[in-house]
Amino acid sequence: MPYLYRVAYDGALFHGFTGHSNSVEAALRRVFGHLLGRGSRTDPGVSAVGNAVLAPSRLPLGYINSRLPRGVWTWAVAEVGEGFNPRRARRRRYLYVAPHWGEDVEAMREVAELFKGTHDFSSFIQFRGERGTPPVTTVDEVGVEVAGRLVYLYFVGKGFRNKQIRKMAWAILAAGRGVVSRRYVEELLERPRPGAVPSAPAEGLILLDIEYDVKFDVDRGELRKAYVYFLEKYRRLEALAAAYRAAGERLLFYDDL
């Protein structure tokens, strides 16, 4: 009987989810022997708290995690039927986080609204040689929130194509900075031009959740280990950011002498 496992990981420590010896999938394969499928293939640098993998056997989550490298955890498991495909999810939820440097919030929200619904997203996809597949996808929700010095972009849909979220994030942020107009983005959706839009940095993207019609058994102890890791890393990076800011301000002080 196959089992579906929830997986969280720090994307900064791995060369993507798959396709490399230092990938998250490679680390999981070394524990399970082999895997039967995955929920989402994330790029190098992209983190996740709710990705999923399908494995042929049930192992204790603590046992799995004790054999995984630092920065990746399984924290829940569900028994599923034969033939279950983890790619066929109800919804996927992503969050993109970026610094807020005064971007126009309303301009960002106007562009975010354009992405809702069903469109040909060729301008916002990096093709992997699958041009025979229609690049039409449906985006259910796109949200823009600003809190303090950060911009939070939320994306919800059944599925997204390669680099699609990072390219949409770039367009939203660029609109807030006045780099592109709402009309420019509309034209890219109406008359697609592959390669017209760059990707926002991978490090700002997090796969929050993949929704399935299954009930997971959550190991709160293993879940907390992942939580503590991310909290401690946040605190370290916050202190590092403050140190860099202080260094920059000191350099300006010398410039005024």
From Swiss-Prot:
It is an enzyme of class 5 (isomerase). The active site is at D43. Keywords: Isomerase, tRNA processing. It comes from the Archaea. Substrate binds at Y94. Belongs to the tRNA pseudouridine synthase TruA family. This is tRNA pseudouridine synthase A. The lineage of its organism: Archaea, Thermoproteota, Thermoprotei, Thermoproteales, Thermoproteaceae. The gene is truA.
